[in-house]
Structure formats: C-alpha cells, structure tokens
Amino acid sequence: MMQLRKFFENPKKAFCFFCFAIIILFTAYRSVNDFFYGGGYQWQETRQTANMAEEVSLSELYGADYEIYPFGINDSTAAVFCTESIGDTMKEEKNFLRKIVLYSMKSGKNIQEILLDHRYFGCSICDYEGGTDILFYTRDRLEQNCLLWFRWDKQKNQMIQILDKTIENPFSDYTLIAEGKSAALISYSAEKNELQSISEEEARPFLKLVGNEIMDLQVESNGTDILVMEKLAEKAQFRIYRNGRSFRTRPLAENEDCYSMHLLKNGALLYLQIEDAGISEKRLVWWPYHGDEVTISTGMLYRGISDHQNTALWNEFSQSGAKLHRVYIDEKKCIHEVLDLEPDYAALPQITLYDRKNRTANIFLNDFQKMGMIPLS
C-alpha cells in the first residue's frame, strides 16, 4: 500500500496511469460494443435510373428455340447454359439441357461449348473466390436421376466436369455450397443427423446438426458459416452455424413462410411471406449476426436474388413500378441502394452479379433472349 501511495504521489506517474486506464476502458467498451452490435447497419438509400450499357442478342447467338440462363460472370466472360422445351402442352412438355457455353463479352464469340442431352429439372449455383460451380439435376436416357457437376475456373477460363453421378434420393437432398475457396456438394443424412460432403467415391461428415427429427432442410453458406432452415415436426426455424457450432437461431412464425434465404458476410437476407388477418405480404428481412432484424422491402414480388459473400442484388415488382435493389456489407454497415428501372427492363427473369468484387454492374436476361450489363454507382 505504501508503494502504491508513493506511486500516486508522483504527478507524472499518476497522469500516465490515468491515461492508460482510459485507453483500456475505451478498448474494452469498443470490444463489447462490437460484440453485441457488430452486425449493425446504416441505411444509405440512393435512387437513380438504371441504363443498359451493353446488350447481346442471345437468340442470334444460340437460336430462338433455346432458353439461355447466365450462371457466372467476370469482366470479360459470361458462362451460360441452354435448355430446350419439347412438347405442345404443359403436360407433354419436356425440358432438355442442351449445352454449356463460355461466351467472350469482348470478342462476341464462344470460348468453350459443352454439348449435353439430359432431361433438365433445375440447378444449384455456387459462386466463390476464384470460380463458379453449377450442379444440374437431370435424368439420363435410361430415365435415371443424375447429378452433373461442372466448375468454371475463372483463372483458366475453362469449364471442367467434376461429377457425373446417378442417385436414388430426391434432387432436393443435394445442393452446392461454398467451402472456403472451393465448393462442396452437400447432402442431408437423416439417419446420422448430419450434412455430408458427397464425392464420386464416398460421403464424408461435413456438419453435425443440432436438434432431432428434422423433416426438411435448406442450406446456404457464405464460405465460412452455414445457414440452415430446419422444418421440425411442430415448428420451423433458421439456424446459423459458425466453426461447426450453433451460433444463432430465429424461429419461423406460424404466419411466415420462407421463399429463399441468402447468407452474406455478417447476416442473412430472408425472403418471407407473411399472412396477417387474411392479407398476404411478401417481405425481405435483414437478419444480422448481432442486433435486431430489419425489414428492407415489402414489394409485391422479388426475382433473381443473387448473392455473393457481401453483396445481394434483386429485382422488385410493386404497383409503383419495378426497381433494382442492392444490399452490400461495407465493414460493419449494411447499405441499401435502389435503382429505378426503365420500362423496357421492368421484367427481368434472372439477375446475376457481375464484377462481384467491385460491385460495378450486373448482367441479366430480358425475356430469355437478351443479355446485358447495367453499371452500378
């Protein structure tokens, strides 16, 4: 005690101690504040008219019989796949996956073309640093359900086939998610209550799930964390896993239904339908890792939601017109931007982010016949 008293009797030492204590307290406050409110956001809503910068006629490139879907973009190349519908009526109509194409935006020519002949039932697209993977749900000539897994290596600018696998389980049991700087093919094992990573040779444990008797499961990833929607016997809920452990949960209310979910850098976008007193409303909700959720938009319909790590882009339809929305994470802020669409581009069937790192433009299809770019501020 005597030594401590002598220490404080020295004005210089006492002043230094006081300053040091202030720094420690301030650092501790910032750490605690970041822990609880690190998922905070600020609305920085801007409005402008979206103008088309470049436009390509897909029907001239690939023929009017095909429907063309973009699934990956960089500054010089578009990756698309082509399907063809055969049959006169909806009951007899069959959809076939015909080709996968890498198209040069600079030269206007195909870089690579892979021809296929499978019945097409949908796909799962996974974008990550360095590449884009696409999983096709198909049926072969023997009427067997097949998974076709392709990888677009953006550095080599080439499509590579990863997997051609016949399956017995439903297509809905399989999806692609980002896993670090690559992608993983994930399947849910109800017997072991875990997600499994599927390869040609084996299925290995990927994530042990919390809870039992999961009836249905949807999975999303931002490359490091996993978002699942669990449908249990009596309820449904969203759960985020971090480092293999349950990190945060959000119950799905009885009057809520989930159309889609998108896990970004420090939060999730949940596209929900709310039933209230006989009135149905579609709602896009931002659910941050820390802090309270916020409703971003309540338009009539959202289409083409595309997400990648820290950016989500989607098209909104409402009675007041069509708009292009962008939400992106800048450090610890969630910034929301709105672009009013010209009437010619008011009905965009599909939107894919372009130049994802710099968030400068997007590419889309107009009536599945045109492909173009819209610069973003």
Predicted region positions:
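N-terminal "mature head" segments of proteins
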Residues: L4-E9, K13-D127
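Residue position within the beta-strands of beta-propeller blades
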Residues: V80-C82, I134-Y137, L185-S187, L227-M229, ...
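Blade-level signature of beta-propeller repeat domains, shared across WD40, Kelch, NHL, RCC1
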Residues: A346-S377
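A short beta-strand motif characteristic of beta-propeller blades
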Residues: E54-L61, K109-L115, Q158-K165, E202-L209, ...
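Short loop/turn segments that connect beta-strands within beta-propeller blades
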Residues: M105-G108, W152-K156, I198-E202, Y241-R245, ...
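Structural motif
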Residues: D88-V101, L142-F150, E191-S197, E234-I240, ...
